[in-house]
Amino acid sequence: MQLIEKAPAKINLSLDALYQHTDGEFEWQMIMTSIDLADYVQITLQDSPQIEVRTSKGYLPEDKRNLAYQAAQLLRHRFDIKTGAIIEIDKHIPVAAGLGGGSSDAAAVLRGLNQLWHLGLTEAELAHIGLSIDSDVPYCVYSETALVTGKGDQIQPLGDLPNFWMVVVKPEVSVSTPRILHALNCDQITDRPQTDRLLAGIQQQDAQQMTAAMANVLTPITNQRYPQIDYLMQRLTAFGAEKAQMSGSGPTVFGICRQYSRAQRIYNSMSGFCREVYLVQPLKK
């Protein structure tokens, strides 16, 4: 048996850290959406008990370091599955970009094997299992616009966003998320997103109100280490984006436009600064 699961990239429309738990984990409040830039994960069952991962990018790990591999092994051991699977990942999402590519691949494996192994798990149950793999996996199980709270495990779907385009730009730097989070002090945050206003903008389908309320509290930390990220955000707004922001811990940034023609011009302009530039839209449910 075989199936193909789409694994969309995620974008942080807002990212706020409310406080740090005694175990070192943060209490998050984020609004996330998925975009029409995606990996494709083909899963084929096999009689042997092995989990095999193959990727279209030769430099990616295909062993237990790969989150998709971890997802398959986790389900297999938890439910005492005797068979194995071949997982082939066609990569399109930039790697180490703050777009949740690895987490989305893992979530796709959870969804796919839930069907192929006839486990009958709900999205909420898959999300709970996924939290032990990576904090972005619970959201990626749903892959729709949502308010994400707790340690990343509490997902509240919000419905579709108002219509707009995004120009997504990934600079040629790699950011270590643990290093960024290690430098995060919740008591020193000054520029937080206006989450209630952002939620209202989504509910009212008001893109202008929505973008005015967006922010990412990790931006100053990442900018300090990688000033080219701030430069790219300045370029996005200079070329006409209504809002420019970093996704996750970076390094990827994105600009929002309500008009396709303007977004296309920004895309063309930014392509002169970076090799990895994408013109995308948020997914509709």
Curated annotation (Swiss-Prot):
Signal peptide: none annotated. Keywords: ATP-binding, Isoprene biosynthesis, Kinase, Nucleotide-binding, Transferase. Pfam families: GHMP_kinases_C (PF08544), GHMP_kinases_N (PF00288). Its EC number is 2.7.1.148. One of its GO terms (biological process) is isopentenyl diphosphate biosynthetic process, methylerythritol 4-phosphate pathway. ATP binds at residues 94-104. Pathway: Isoprenoid biosynthesis; isopentenyl diphosphate biosynthesis via DXP pathway; isopentenyl diphosphate from 1-deoxy-D-xylulose 5-phosphate: step 3/6. It catalyses: 4-CDP-2-C-methyl-D-erythritol + ATP = 4-CDP-2-C-methyl-D-erythritol 2-phosphate + ADP + H(+). InterPro entries: GHMP_kinase_C_dom, GHMP_kinase_C_sf, GHMP_kinase_N_dom, IspE, Ribosomal_Su5_D2-typ_SF, Ribsml_uS5_D2-typ_fold_subgr. GO terms for molecular function: 4-(cytidine 5'-diphospho)-2-C-methyl-D-erythritol kinase activity; ATP binding. The active site is at 10, 136. PANTHER family: 4-DIPHOSPHOCYTIDYL-2-C-METHYL-D-ERYTHRITOL KINASE, CHLOROPLASTIC. Catalyzes the phosphorylation of the position 2 hydroxy group of 4-diphosphocytidyl-2C-methyl-D-erythritol. Belongs to the GHMP kinase family. IspE subfamily. This is 4-diphosphocytidyl-2-C-methyl-D-erythritol kinase. The gene is ispE.
